[in-house]
């Protein structure tokens, strides 16, 4: 079987932290950098939005006078967990909440810039926003000292490079949430996926389609290591081999894939990688078999790359899962879309999502619109072709956990159309 090829460029340099020096700095730098960058963008958009209104700072607000302010949102949440609550004697007074969402009707938004902060009221729904988003607001200060919002300006979907014209079918397969080592993991199910991709399964037609698969992206949470091994105690020698077993099994299965085609390996929240974003590539020494092939690429999370000039950006899901905890939307795709409109992959970092304390940049800013934006480890498969005001076209993909669904996602580079690969090993009648 002759496999098609695609020209690949890894664009993960901006997420590398090897050159960074940690000197005890806090997170104010990353917020300042974000505000400075986004404010310049929003100021450039104001003349075409509300050219007759003055732009002022929070400190420069005057009661009853219409104006525009630009700043970073802070969402005051009654139910948001606090480290102080862990040690509070009055802990029982705090209402119990479901761990998946911390929203409350009394939540309110505050806008902050270098000069000060002001509580927001009016036409801005707290449920739709999170801490860390930079926006412009039209409104006026009230006698109570609040800012009454009348209209909102977001940065919007960023500019996009032209989508190349590809005349033949070439596919990228996305899979996430393998959870090798967990009770849910079904090795036969994953082996069926591998056999299908490598062309060892199916009739001539299916093998012909498989030969058009040019790359596989594994979007995080590939292994599951029992938390009981990480209780602060020294790991017994007999348990050390058990910890390594899921990684060894993953390596054996990856080796089958990389022997046939290129594979990008992204870390996730459950993988043996650093906790905070951007997660650095999994060390190649973990993959004794797969790493011997030049088709194996260990990548960061977030991961950005180009295939035949089609630009991809994606995460292993932590950024969208965190938005789900602190805001509301009709589905996960709406959260994904919001991060594009806010031009920021992870607005809740570093407030509620761990990230590295950069001093001179915010690597999660989205300066160029991708053609494909994927998010791993979601509850179900969802996709949408999003169109921007400047004719941008973005394929949004929520990749389901494979251990739960047996579903991988296949994208055609020619037209950005998506389909699923579903595998089941159930023998029920």
From Swiss-Prot:
| Primary residence | nucleus
**InterPro entries, per database record:** DNA_pol_a/d/e_bsu, DNA_pol_D_N, DNA_pol_delta/II_ssu, PolD2_C
Highest taxon in the source lineage? Eukaryota
> How the protein assembles, per its UniProt entry?
Heterodimer with subunits of 125 kDa and 50 kDa.
Q: What is its EC number?
A: 2.7.7.7
This chain is encoded by the gene named POLD2
GO MF entry, a single one = DNA binding
Q: Where in the cell is it found?
A: Nucleus
Taxonomically, what lineage is the organism?
Answer: Eukaryota, Viridiplantae, Streptophyta, Embryophyta, Tracheophyta
Q: Which UniProt keywords apply?
A: DNA replication, DNA-directed DNA polymerase, Nucleotidyltransferase, Nucleus, Transferase
Q: What is this protein called?
A: DNA polymerase delta small subunit
Describe the family membership recorded for this protein in Swiss-Prot or TrEMBL: Belongs to the DNA polymerase delta/II small subunit family.
Q: Name one GO cellular component term.
A: delta DNA polymerase complex
Instruction: Kindly name one Pfam family recorded for this protein.
Output: DNA_pol_E_B
- Primary role: The function of the small subunit is not yet clear.
**Species in which this protein is naturally found:** Oryza sativa subsp. japonica
Q: Name one GO biological process term.
A: DNA strand elongation involved in DNA replication
Q: Which catalysed reactions does the entry list for this protein?
A: DNA(n) + a 2'-deoxyribonucleoside 5'-triphosphate = DNA(n+1) + diphosphate
């Amino acid at each position: 079987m002759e496999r098609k090829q695609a020209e690949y460029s890894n664009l993960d340099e901006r997420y590398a932290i090897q050159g960074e020096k940690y000197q005890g700095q806090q997170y104010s730098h990353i917020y300042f950098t974000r505000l400075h960058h986004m404010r310049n963008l929003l100021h450039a958009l104001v003349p075409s939005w509300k050219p007759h209104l003055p732009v002022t700072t929070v400190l420069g607000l005057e009661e009853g006078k219409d104006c525009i302010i630009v700043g970073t949102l802070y969402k005051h949440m009654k139910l948001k967990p606090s480290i102080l609550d862990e040690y509070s004697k009055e802990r029982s007074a705090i209402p119990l909440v479901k761990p998946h969402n911390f929203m409350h009707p009394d939540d309110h938004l505050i806008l902050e810039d270098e000069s000060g902060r002001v509580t927001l009221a009016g036409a801005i729904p707290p449920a739709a926003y999170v801490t860390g988003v930079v926006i412009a607001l039209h409104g006026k200060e009230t006698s109570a000292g609040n800012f009454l919002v009348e209209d909102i300006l977001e940065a919007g979907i960023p500019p996009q490079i032209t989508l190349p014209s590809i005349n033949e079918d070439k596919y990228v397969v996305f899979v996430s949430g393998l959870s090798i080592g967990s009770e849910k993991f079904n090795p036969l199910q994953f082996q069926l996926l591998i056999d299908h991709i490598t062309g060892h399964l199916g009739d001539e037609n299916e093998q012909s389609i498989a030969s058009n698969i040019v790359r596989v992206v594994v979007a995080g949470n590939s292994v599951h290591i029992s938390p009981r091994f990480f209780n602060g105690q020294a790991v017994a020698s007999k348990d050390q081999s058990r910890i390594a077993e899921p990684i060894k099994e993953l390596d054996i299965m990856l080796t089958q894939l990389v022997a046939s085609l290129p594979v990008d390996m992204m870390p996730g929240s459950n993988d043996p990688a650093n906790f905070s974003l951007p997660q650095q590539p999994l060390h190649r020494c973990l993959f004794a078999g797969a790493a011997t092939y030049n088709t194996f690429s260990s990548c960061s999370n977030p991961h950005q790359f180009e295939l035949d000039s089609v630009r991809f950006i994606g995460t292993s899901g932590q950024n969208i899962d965190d938005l789900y905890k602190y805001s509301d939307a009709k589905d996960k795709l709406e959260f994904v879309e919001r991060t594009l409109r806010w031009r920021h992959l992870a607005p809740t970092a570093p407030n509620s999502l761990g990230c590295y304390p950069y001093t001179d940049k915010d690597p999660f800013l989205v300066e160029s619109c991708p053609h494909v934006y994927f998010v791993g480890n979601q509850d179900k498969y969802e996709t949408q072709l999003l169109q921007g005001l400047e004719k941008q076209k973005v394929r949004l993909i929520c990749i389901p956990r494979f251990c739960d669904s047996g579903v991988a996602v296949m994208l055609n580079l020619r037209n950005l159309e998506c389909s699923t690969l579903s595998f089941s090993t159930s023998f029920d009648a």
